[in-house]
Swiss-Prot record:
Organism, scientific name: Dehalococcoides mccartyi (strain ATCC BAA-2266 / KCTC 15142 / 195)
The name this protein goes by in its record: Small ribosomal subunit protein uS3
A Pfam family it matches: KH_2
Classification via SUPFAM superfamilies: Prokaryotic type KH domain (KH-domain type II) (SSF54814), Ribosomal protein S3 C-terminal domain (SSF54821)
Function: Binds the lower part of the 30S subunit head. Binds mRNA in the 70S ribosome, positioning it for translation.
Region named Disordered: 244-278
Length: 278
């Protein structure tokens, strides 16, 4: 049975970047990974209603830079940046290191796969029909400029006893095209009858490599002179070039020339003999 590859992991290093940028030794790797999990869980728990899509972590010696991508930066920042300072102090106490907190705003939440999945999950938790929630999410994403979207819901849909899976899609979602900018997000909707899993793929267009600047061909000194010189000067240069380089005489040409000279020599010799007899 085939397995689907994670769309973001499949494109890492090509058009996608890592969410954690740091290097650690074999002994310190587990510690850094545990700190990353603590940071992400603490931020997600503290800002449930902030529409946080992704948390990027970068480490430099004893300093940790945390970038939070959110569609509602006002909730995270607070009045006069008060909540940012509180969150930074909380994270520093959590891991025992200096933390720099950056807030990155998401301009279009309808093109972010995780935020689309969260909106569908929240509607299902409020007892909205799952088909209606999925159709609304697809419509809003396509209106926002998405080239294609696919939404998958799995679980006890509609309260039935047997779990099933339902998929809705619109437009193109080329999963095997590496240059295709496909965002992927998944989450859960917690209901009284159990959890319902939501997966979303959003195709936002192709990311083409930057065109390399073509270097101009090297112009030699002779070519520059020929380009600047008038037609008469060019003709003189060609004549001088032919004069300076004499034609090479082949053996065949020499034989033909000697054959032509033989009759002339015989006629001249006969003429000399006639003059002597007279």
């Amino acid at each position: 049975m085939g397995r689907k590859v994670h769309p973001i992991g499949f494109r890492l290093g090509i058009i996608k970047d890592w969410s954690a940028k740091w290097h650690a030794s074999d002994k310190g790797f587990a510690e850094c990974l545990t700190e990353d999990l603590k940071l992400r869980k603490a931020i997600a728990k503290k800002y449930v209603d902030a529409a946080i899509s992704q948390v990027d972590i970068e480490r430099q010696s004893n300093k940790v830079t945390v970038s939070v991508r959110t569609a509602r930066p006002g909730i995270v920042i607070g009045r006069g940046g008060q909540r940012v300072d509180e969150m930074r102090h909380f994270l520093e106490e959590l891991i025992g290191k200096k933390v720099q907190l950056n807030i990155v705003e998401i301009s279009q939440a309808e093109l972010d796969a995780f935020l689309v999945a969260r909106s569908v999950a929240e509607q299902i938790e409020r007892r909205v029909a799952y088909r209606r929630a999925m159709k609304q999410a697809i419509f809003r994403s396509m209106q926002a400029g998405a080239k294609g979207i696919k939404v998958c819901a799995s679980g006890r849909l509609g309260g039935v006893e047997i779990a099933r899976r339902e998929v809705m899609h619109e437009g193109r979602v080329p999963l095997h095209t590496l240059r295709a900018d496909i965002d992927y997000g998944c989450t859960r909707a917690h209901t009284a009858l159990g959890d319902i899993g939501i997966k979303v793929w959003v195709y936002r267009g192709d990311i083409l490599p930057e065109a390399k600047e073509q270097s101009e061909p090297e112009v030699t000194e002779m070519a520059a002179v020929m380009a600047d010189a008038p037609a008469a000067a060019v003709a003189e240069a060609k004549v001088a070039d032919t004069v300076a380089k004499p034609k090479r005489v082949t053996k065949k040409a020499e034989a033909e020339a000697s054959a032509e000279e033989k009759p002339k020599r015989a006629a001249k010799k006969a003429e000399n003999i006639t003059k002597e007899e007279e």
